[in-house]
Protein backbone atom coordinates (compact mmCIF):
# COMPACT_ATOMS: atom_id res chain seq x y z
CA UNK A 1 0.00 0.00 0.00
CA UNK A 2 2.82 2.37 0.85
CA UNK A 3 4.40 1.77 -2.56
CA UNK A 4 1.06 2.33 -4.30
CA UNK A 5 0.54 5.57 -2.38
CA UNK A 6 4.03 6.74 -3.33
CA UNK A 7 3.33 6.01 -6.98
CA UNK A 8 0.01 7.87 -6.77
CA UNK A 9 1.69 10.89 -5.19
CA UNK A 10 4.32 10.87 -7.96
CA UNK A 11 1.61 10.87 -10.62
CA UNK A 12 -0.41 13.55 -8.87
CA UNK A 13 2.62 15.80 -8.53
CA UNK A 14 3.40 15.50 -12.24
CA UNK A 15 6.39 13.20 -11.74
CA UNK A 16 5.03 10.33 -13.83
CA UNK A 17 7.51 11.03 -16.63
CA UNK A 18 10.38 10.92 -14.16
CA UNK A 19 9.06 7.66 -12.75
CA UNK A 20 8.93 6.17 -16.25
CA UNK A 21 12.46 7.33 -16.98
CA UNK A 22 13.60 5.73 -13.76
CA UNK A 23 12.07 2.39 -14.71
CA UNK A 24 13.69 2.54 -18.15
CA UNK A 25 17.09 3.09 -16.56
CA UNK A 26 16.44 0.18 -14.22
CA UNK A 27 16.22 2.16 -10.98
CA UNK A 28 12.75 1.93 -9.43
CA UNK A 29 11.18 5.34 -8.87
CA UNK A 30 8.44 3.85 -6.71
CA UNK A 31 10.76 2.36 -4.09
CA UNK A 32 13.78 4.67 -3.83
CA UNK A 33 17.09 2.91 -3.31
CA UNK A 34 16.12 -0.30 -5.09
CA UNK A 35 17.12 -1.51 -8.56
CA UNK A 36 14.28 -3.32 -10.33
CA UNK A 37 15.04 -5.38 -13.43
CA UNK A 38 12.14 -4.90 -15.83
CA UNK A 39 12.15 -6.17 -19.42
CA UNK A 40 9.77 -7.35 -22.16
CA UNK A 41 11.83 -10.55 -22.08
CA UNK A 42 10.11 -11.44 -18.77
CA UNK A 43 6.79 -9.56 -18.71
CA UNK A 44 4.82 -9.30 -15.50
CA UNK A 45 7.72 -9.80 -13.13
CA UNK A 46 10.78 -8.03 -11.79
CA UNK A 47 13.81 -8.85 -9.68
CA UNK A 48 14.99 -6.18 -7.26
CA UNK A 49 18.25 -5.53 -5.42
CA UNK A 50 18.86 -2.89 -2.78
CA UNK A 51 21.25 -0.21 -4.03
CA UNK A 52 23.87 1.10 -1.63
CA UNK A 53 25.51 3.41 -4.17
CA UNK A 54 25.50 3.99 -7.92
CA UNK A 55 29.16 3.81 -8.96
CA UNK A 56 28.88 4.48 -12.70
CA UNK A 57 26.30 5.47 -15.28
CA UNK A 58 27.08 5.98 -18.95
CA UNK A 59 25.73 5.53 -22.45
CA UNK A 60 27.88 3.91 -25.10
CA UNK A 61 27.17 3.77 -28.82
CA UNK A 62 25.18 0.59 -28.17
CA UNK A 63 23.60 0.59 -24.73
CA UNK A 64 23.19 2.13 -21.29
CA UNK A 65 25.84 0.94 -18.85
CA UNK A 66 25.54 1.10 -15.08
CA UNK A 67 27.46 -0.23 -12.09
CA UNK A 68 26.09 -0.11 -8.57
CA UNK A 69 27.06 -1.42 -5.16
CA UNK A 70 24.31 -3.69 -3.86
CA UNK A 71 23.75 -4.61 -0.24
CA UNK A 72 23.81 -8.40 -0.78
CA UNK A 73 25.46 -9.24 -4.13
CA UNK A 74 28.45 -6.89 -4.19
CA UNK A 75 29.03 -4.76 -7.26
CA UNK A 76 26.55 -5.25 -10.11
CA UNK A 77 27.00 -4.58 -13.85
CA UNK A 78 23.81 -3.62 -15.69
CA UNK A 79 23.37 -3.19 -19.46
CA UNK A 80 20.16 -1.55 -20.71
CA UNK A 81 18.49 -2.21 -17.37
CA UNK A 82 19.40 -5.93 -17.28
CA UNK A 83 21.83 -7.49 -14.80
CA UNK A 84 24.87 -9.03 -16.49
CA UNK A 85 27.24 -9.69 -13.59
CA UNK A 86 27.25 -9.58 -9.81
CA UNK A 87 30.32 -10.24 -7.70
CA UNK A 88 28.50 -12.84 -5.62
CA UNK A 89 27.15 -15.22 -8.27
CA UNK A 90 29.19 -14.52 -11.44
CA UNK A 91 31.20 -17.71 -10.90
CA UNK A 92 28.23 -19.94 -11.76
CA UNK A 93 27.79 -18.45 -15.21
CA UNK A 94 31.43 -17.79 -16.14
CA UNK A 95 32.68 -21.22 -15.06
CA UNK A 96 29.87 -23.20 -16.66
CA UNK A 97 29.78 -21.45 -20.05
CA UNK A 98 33.55 -21.97 -20.30
CA UNK A 99 34.29 -25.38 -18.85
CA UNK A 100 31.27 -27.22 -20.25
CA UNK A 101 32.75 -26.96 -23.78
CA UNK A 102 36.47 -26.86 -22.99
CA UNK A 103 36.42 -29.88 -20.67
CA UNK A 104 34.58 -31.88 -23.34
CA UNK A 105 37.41 -31.88 -25.91
CA UNK A 106 41.05 -32.86 -25.76
CA UNK A 107 43.68 -30.11 -25.48
CA UNK A 108 41.91 -27.09 -27.04
CA UNK A 109 44.48 -24.70 -28.48
CA UNK A 110 42.60 -21.86 -30.19
CA UNK A 111 39.53 -20.34 -28.54
CA UNK A 112 37.29 -17.48 -29.66
CA UNK A 113 35.04 -15.56 -27.26
CA UNK A 114 32.22 -13.49 -28.77
CA UNK A 115 31.01 -10.86 -26.32
CA UNK A 116 32.28 -11.38 -22.80
CA UNK A 117 33.54 -7.83 -22.39
CA UNK A 118 33.58 -8.16 -18.61
CA UNK A 119 36.52 -10.58 -18.92
CA UNK A 120 35.05 -13.41 -16.86
CA UNK A 121 35.06 -16.00 -19.63
CA UNK A 122 38.65 -15.04 -20.47
CA UNK A 123 39.59 -15.63 -16.84
CA UNK A 124 38.18 -19.15 -17.04
CA UNK A 125 39.59 -19.99 -20.49
CA UNK A 126 43.04 -19.01 -19.24
CA UNK A 127 42.86 -21.83 -16.68
CA UNK A 128 43.44 -24.28 -19.55
CA UNK A 129 47.18 -24.73 -20.07
CA UNK A 130 46.69 -26.34 -23.50
CA UNK A 131 45.25 -23.10 -24.91
CA UNK A 132 47.75 -21.13 -26.99
CA UNK A 133 45.54 -18.40 -28.50
CA UNK A 134 42.46 -16.64 -27.11
CA UNK A 135 40.66 -14.15 -29.35
CA UNK A 136 37.85 -12.05 -27.93
CA UNK A 137 35.55 -9.86 -30.01
CA UNK A 138 33.44 -7.43 -27.95
CA UNK A 139 31.32 -4.79 -29.66
CA UNK A 140 31.25 -2.30 -26.77
CA UNK A 141 34.55 -0.92 -25.50
CA UNK A 142 32.79 0.80 -22.60
CA UNK A 143 31.93 -2.61 -21.14
CA UNK A 144 35.60 -3.59 -21.20
CA UNK A 145 36.74 -0.31 -19.65
CA UNK A 146 34.07 -0.37 -16.93
CA UNK A 147 34.91 -3.96 -16.04
CA UNK A 148 38.60 -3.15 -15.72
CA UNK A 149 37.74 -0.28 -13.38
CA UNK A 150 35.09 -1.90 -11.19
CA UNK A 151 35.48 -5.68 -11.61
CA UNK A 152 39.23 -6.41 -11.56
CA UNK A 153 38.63 -10.02 -10.45
CA UNK A 154 36.83 -10.53 -13.79
CA UNK A 155 38.97 -8.29 -15.98
CA UNK A 156 42.10 -10.17 -14.90
CA UNK A 157 41.35 -12.30 -17.95
CA UNK A 158 42.50 -9.48 -20.22
CA UNK A 159 45.97 -9.62 -18.68
CA UNK A 160 46.76 -13.07 -20.05
CA UNK A 161 49.39 -12.76 -22.84
CA UNK A 162 47.50 -15.31 -24.94
CA UNK A 163 44.55 -12.91 -25.24
CA UNK A 164 43.96 -10.67 -28.28
CA UNK A 165 41.13 -8.15 -27.84
CA UNK A 166 39.16 -7.06 -30.90
CA UNK A 167 36.61 -4.26 -30.48
CA UNK A 168 33.95 -4.77 -33.12
CA UNK A 169 31.03 -6.77 -34.40
CA UNK A 170 31.31 -10.46 -33.56
CA UNK A 171 29.23 -11.46 -36.57
CA UNK A 172 31.61 -9.68 -38.95
CA UNK A 173 34.65 -11.04 -37.10
CA UNK A 174 33.46 -14.61 -37.55
CA UNK A 175 32.70 -14.11 -41.23
CA UNK A 176 36.29 -12.99 -41.76
CA UNK A 177 37.85 -15.82 -39.73
CA UNK A 178 39.63 -18.46 -41.82
CA UNK A 179 37.72 -21.72 -42.09
CA UNK A 180 38.54 -24.27 -39.39
CA UNK A 181 40.50 -21.82 -37.21
CA UNK A 182 39.15 -22.55 -33.74
CA UNK A 183 38.84 -25.56 -31.47
CA UNK A 184 36.12 -23.80 -29.46
CA UNK A 185 33.88 -20.75 -29.74
CA UNK A 186 32.15 -19.35 -26.64
CA UNK A 187 29.31 -16.90 -27.26
CA UNK A 188 28.80 -14.84 -24.10
CA UNK A 189 25.92 -12.73 -25.33
CA UNK A 190 23.21 -10.70 -23.67
CA UNK A 191 19.54 -11.40 -24.43
CA UNK A 192 18.33 -11.47 -28.07
CA UNK A 193 17.29 -7.83 -28.16
CA UNK A 194 19.42 -4.90 -29.31
CA UNK A 195 23.02 -5.56 -30.44
CA UNK A 196 22.89 -9.26 -29.49
CA UNK A 197 19.93 -10.17 -31.71
CA UNK A 198 22.06 -11.53 -34.57
CA UNK A 199 23.90 -13.91 -32.24
CA UNK A 200 20.78 -16.08 -31.93
CA UNK A 201 20.04 -16.48 -35.65
CA UNK A 202 20.87 -19.26 -38.11
CA UNK A 203 23.37 -17.31 -40.28
CA UNK A 204 25.46 -16.64 -37.18
CA UNK A 205 25.54 -20.33 -36.25
CA UNK A 206 26.60 -21.11 -39.82
CA UNK A 207 29.52 -18.71 -39.44
CA UNK A 208 30.47 -20.36 -36.15
CA UNK A 209 30.41 -23.83 -37.73
CA UNK A 210 32.62 -22.65 -40.59
CA UNK A 211 35.17 -21.16 -38.19
CA UNK A 212 35.44 -24.38 -36.16
CA UNK A 213 37.71 -27.29 -36.96
CA UNK A 214 36.16 -30.77 -37.46
CA UNK A 215 34.95 -31.85 -34.03
CA UNK A 216 35.20 -28.29 -32.75
CA UNK A 217 32.71 -27.05 -30.17
CA UNK A 218 30.57 -24.01 -29.48
CA UNK A 219 28.80 -22.98 -26.30
CA UNK A 220 26.32 -20.12 -26.38
CA UNK A 221 24.12 -18.50 -23.77
CA UNK A 222 20.65 -19.94 -24.36
CA UNK A 223 18.13 -18.26 -22.06
CA UNK A 224 15.84 -19.67 -19.34
CA UNK A 225 13.72 -22.80 -19.58
CA UNK A 226 11.15 -21.09 -17.33
CA UNK A 227 10.73 -17.99 -19.47
CA UNK A 228 11.99 -18.54 -22.99
CA UNK A 229 11.09 -22.01 -24.29
CA UNK A 230 9.91 -20.43 -27.56
CA UNK A 231 13.37 -18.91 -28.06
CA UNK A 232 15.10 -22.13 -27.00
CA UNK A 233 12.99 -24.09 -29.51
CA UNK A 234 14.25 -21.87 -32.32
CA UNK A 235 17.86 -22.08 -31.14
CA UNK A 236 17.73 -25.88 -30.94
CA UNK A 237 16.10 -26.15 -34.38
CA UNK A 238 18.71 -23.87 -35.96
CA UNK A 239 21.60 -25.70 -34.31
CA UNK A 240 20.37 -29.13 -35.38
CA UNK A 241 20.27 -27.89 -38.97
CA UNK A 242 23.75 -26.37 -38.84
CA UNK A 243 25.85 -28.62 -36.58
CA UNK A 244 26.29 -32.22 -37.71
CA UNK A 245 28.00 -33.50 -34.56
CA UNK A 246 26.48 -33.32 -31.08
CA UNK A 247 23.73 -30.87 -30.07
CA UNK A 248 22.87 -30.57 -26.38
CA UNK A 249 21.16 -28.17 -23.98
CA UNK A 250 22.45 -27.62 -20.43
CA UNK A 251 21.41 -25.29 -17.64
CA UNK A 252 22.56 -23.95 -14.31
CA UNK A 253 21.45 -21.70 -11.46
CA UNK A 254 22.37 -18.01 -11.28
CA UNK A 255 20.25 -16.29 -8.59
CA UNK A 256 20.30 -12.81 -10.13
CA UNK A 257 19.34 -13.91 -13.64
CA UNK A 258 15.64 -13.93 -14.60
CA UNK A 259 13.92 -16.97 -13.01
CA UNK A 260 17.22 -17.85 -11.31
CA UNK A 261 18.47 -20.11 -14.11
CA UNK A 262 20.30 -19.77 -17.42
CA UNK A 263 20.82 -22.25 -20.23
CA UNK A 264 23.62 -23.12 -22.63
CA UNK A 265 23.51 -24.58 -26.13
CA UNK A 266 26.47 -26.89 -26.78
CA UNK A 267 27.17 -28.12 -30.31
CA UNK A 268 30.01 -29.75 -32.22
CA UNK A 269 30.86 -29.88 -35.88
CA UNK A 270 31.12 -33.09 -37.87
CA UNK A 271 34.32 -34.94 -37.03
CA UNK A 272 35.65 -36.58 -33.86
CA UNK A 273 32.71 -37.43 -31.60
CA UNK A 274 32.08 -35.07 -28.68
CA UNK A 275 30.17 -36.39 -25.67
CA UNK A 276 29.31 -33.17 -23.86
CA UNK A 277 27.64 -34.96 -20.96
CA UNK A 278 30.83 -36.69 -19.83
CA UNK A 279 33.87 -34.38 -19.45
CA UNK A 280 37.24 -35.77 -20.47
CA UNK A 281 39.33 -33.15 -18.65
CA UNK A 282 39.19 -32.74 -14.87
CA UNK A 283 39.99 -29.07 -14.41
CA UNK A 284 39.03 -28.76 -10.75
CA UNK A 285 42.08 -30.82 -9.73
CA UNK A 286 44.39 -29.28 -12.33
CA UNK A 287 47.44 -27.66 -10.75
CA UNK A 288 47.87 -25.05 -13.51
CA UNK A 289 44.27 -23.89 -13.12
CA UNK A 290 44.42 -23.57 -9.34
CA UNK A 291 47.82 -21.89 -9.35
CA UNK A 292 46.93 -19.34 -12.01
CA UNK A 293 43.39 -18.34 -10.96
CA UNK A 294 42.68 -20.00 -7.60
CA UNK A 295 40.21 -22.82 -6.93
CA UNK A 296 36.97 -23.05 -8.87
CA UNK A 297 33.92 -21.83 -6.95
CA UNK A 298 31.09 -23.56 -8.84
CA UNK A 299 32.04 -25.96 -11.64
CA UNK A 300 33.03 -29.58 -11.05
CA UNK A 301 32.74 -32.79 -13.06
CA UNK A 302 29.57 -33.89 -11.26
CA UNK A 303 27.71 -30.64 -11.89
CA UNK A 304 28.95 -30.75 -15.51
CA UNK A 305 27.09 -34.00 -16.17
CA UNK A 306 24.09 -33.02 -14.04
CA UNK A 307 23.56 -29.80 -16.00
CA UNK A 308 22.28 -31.82 -18.98
CA UNK A 309 19.44 -33.37 -16.95
CA UNK A 310 16.33 -31.46 -18.01
CA UNK A 311 12.89 -31.14 -16.40
CA UNK A 312 10.29 -33.20 -18.23
CA UNK A 313 8.56 -30.21 -19.85
CA UNK A 314 11.84 -28.91 -21.29
CA UNK A 315 12.99 -32.37 -22.31
CA UNK A 316 9.82 -32.91 -24.34
CA UNK A 317 10.09 -29.60 -26.17
CA UNK A 318 13.82 -29.83 -26.87
CA UNK A 319 13.52 -33.50 -27.85
CA UNK A 320 10.76 -32.64 -30.33
CA UNK A 321 13.31 -30.60 -32.29
CA UNK A 322 15.59 -33.60 -32.75
CA UNK A 323 14.45 -34.17 -36.31
Curated annotation (Swiss-Prot):
Identification of the protein by name: Spermidine synthase 1
Record GO terms (molecular function): spermidine synthase activity
EC numbers on record: 2.5.1.16
Classification via InterPro entries: PABS, PABS_CS, SAM-dependent_MTases_sf, Spermi_synthase, Spermi_synthase_euk, Spermidine_synt_N, Spermidine_synt_N_sf
Positions with a binding annotation for putrescine: 93, 188-191, 257
Protein family (similarity comment): Belongs to the spermidine/spermine synthase family.
Residue intervals of the PABS domain: 32-269
Residue numbers binding S-adenosyl 3-(methylsulfanyl)propylamine: 63, 94, 118, 138, 169-170, 188
Amino acid sequence: MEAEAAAKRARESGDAAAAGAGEQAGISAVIPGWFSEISPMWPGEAHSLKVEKVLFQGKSDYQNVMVFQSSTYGKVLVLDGVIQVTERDECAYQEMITHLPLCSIKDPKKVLVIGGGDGGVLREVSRHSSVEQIDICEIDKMVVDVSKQFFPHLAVGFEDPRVSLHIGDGVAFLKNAPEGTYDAVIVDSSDPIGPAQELFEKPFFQSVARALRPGGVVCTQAESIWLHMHIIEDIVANCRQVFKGSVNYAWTTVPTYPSGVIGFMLCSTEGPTVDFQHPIFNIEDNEFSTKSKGPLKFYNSEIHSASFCLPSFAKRVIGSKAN
